[in-house]
Amino acid sequence: MKFPASVLASVFLFVAETTAALSLSSTYRSGGDRMWQALTLLFSLLPCALVQLTLLFVHRDLSRDRPLVLLLHLLQLGPLFRCFEVFCIYFQSGNNEEPYVSITKKRQMPKNGLSEEIEKEVGQAEGKLITHRSAFSRASVIQAFLGSAPQLTLQLYISVMQQDVTVGRSLLMTISLLSIVYGALRCNILAIKIKYDEYEVKVKPLAYVCIFLWRSFEIATRVVVLVLFTSVLKTWVVVIILINFFSFFLYPWILFWCSGSPFPENIEKALSRVGTTIVLCFLTLLYTGINMFCWSAVQLKIDSPDLISKSHNWYQLLVYYMIRFIENAILLLLWYLFKTDIYMYVCAPLLVLQLLIGYCTAILFMLVFYQFFHPCKKLFSSSVSEGFQRWLRCFCWACRQQKPCEPIGKEDLQSSRDRDETPSSSKTSPEPGQFLNAEDLCSA
């Protein structure tokens, strides 16, 4: 039985960020900054409440008679109680022999084109730990993108405008960044386990390191770009946020309406149609919050029973990063054109170059992960390197086809004039290189 390290990490980030936010809000209050205090408390307490509801929903405690658990969640102590319960189950699992076990069947990763199916016994204690890990993974994602991401953006904006970074603010920003990166990492692992549910997935430590670096560069550069743009064009940032929000929020619903599928009723038996709609809207809101800052890795599909698309769409991944890179470049260009005196001692071209290189570095680590460290890379129909080679061949073929077109047209015109001037009996033999078709160029 695995040690519940993910549960411990989730609880640590939850407690550390909440404590740092409450301490910083008291500092803002003593300094007379009421607006910063209110926003700091909002981005701290709102995800706390959502985390409590998530844990209650996953464990189905709302329909069970557990008043103490409900009271602890109302006091915002639910994650601490759940963590204590997890470690009690873990340390007591080896002492008691379980009378009932369930059998799960998983397929191993293919070796030499063959994949074996293995059976594994899962006891009640291990099943409870799996449920707890799943609940805390979802809670970490909610805390990261509905609380930590806005909190990090807010505190960095305050630091830029005040031109001062205090110890409490830097501590909160560091914890918030770690929380966002951890939440994005859980999104990647969750996407892999959902898409390859039939297989036994084992993620290596180097894969975790690669995902951590990928997400760190991606999220850090995105937050800095948004803060820089907000500091000079406060009105237009609302337009950017609304465009991003409605684009990602409406996209799954548009696909659902176009598919003509019936409204999903099998999310939770105890939920009514109104409750199901609220849950779907909340999931869409979370999906939107993730994509505002980074690639979600999990594609929401409302017409699917699992609500998650199990197909890996490389096209969506490519389009997302192309559009996001162009958007970041445009926002940085606008910041460079309209920057104020607070950036007097900042080398603006160097900062723009560093941010663009940082985002490209994130894309590089993403490609390295999918090429070398993805646990299910053997199941891919094509790898990243093969796709890049095909794209390079097509690009070279297009360039070679375009270059001979101009001289061919001129030489054909000259040869036709020569035919008109010379007698019909005399014929000129064309050079073989002048009339190569597209297939010969491609084979060459």
UniProtKB/Swiss-Prot annotation:
The chain crosses the membrane at residues 3-23, 38-58, 69-89, 141-161, 172-192, 209-229, 236-256, 278-298, 318-338, 350-370. It is found in: Endoplasmic reticulum membrane. Not glycosylated. Residues 408-444 are annotated as: Disordered. Residues 24-37, 90-140, 193-208, 257-277, 339-349 are extracellular. The modification Phosphoserine is found at residue 115. Pfam families: XK-related. Its main location: endoplasmic reticulum. Signal peptide: none annotated. Residues 423-432 have a biased composition (Low complexity). GO terms for biological process: amino acid transport; intracellular calcium ion homeostasis; intracellular magnesium ion homeostasis; myelination; regulation of axon diameter; regulation of cell size; skeletal muscle fiber development. Residues 1-2, 59-68, 162-171, 230-235, 299-317, 371-444 are cytoplasmic. It comes from the Eukaryota. One of its GO terms (molecular function) is protein-macromolecule adaptor activity. Residues 408-422 have a biased composition (Basic and acidic residues). It is a multi-pass membrane protein. High levels in skeletal muscle, heart, brain, and pancreas; low levels in placenta, lung, liver, and kidney. The keyword Repeat does not apply. The keyword Phosphoprotein applies. InterPro entries: XK-rel, XK-related_adapter. Recruits the lipid transfer protein VPS13A from lipid droplets to the endoplasmic reticulum (ER) membrane. It is linked to McLeod syndrome: A multisystem disorder characterized by the absence of red blood cell Kx antigen, weak expression of Kell red blood cell antigens, acanthocytosis, and compensated hemolysis. Most carriers of this McLeod blood group phenotype have acanthocytosis and elevated serum creatine kinase levels and are prone to develop a severe neurologic disorder resembling Huntington disease. Heterodimer with Kell; disulfide-linked. Interacts with VPS13A. This is Endoplasmic reticulum membrane adapter protein XK. The lineage of its organism: Eukaryota, Metazoa, Chordata, Craniata, Vertebrata. The gene is XK.
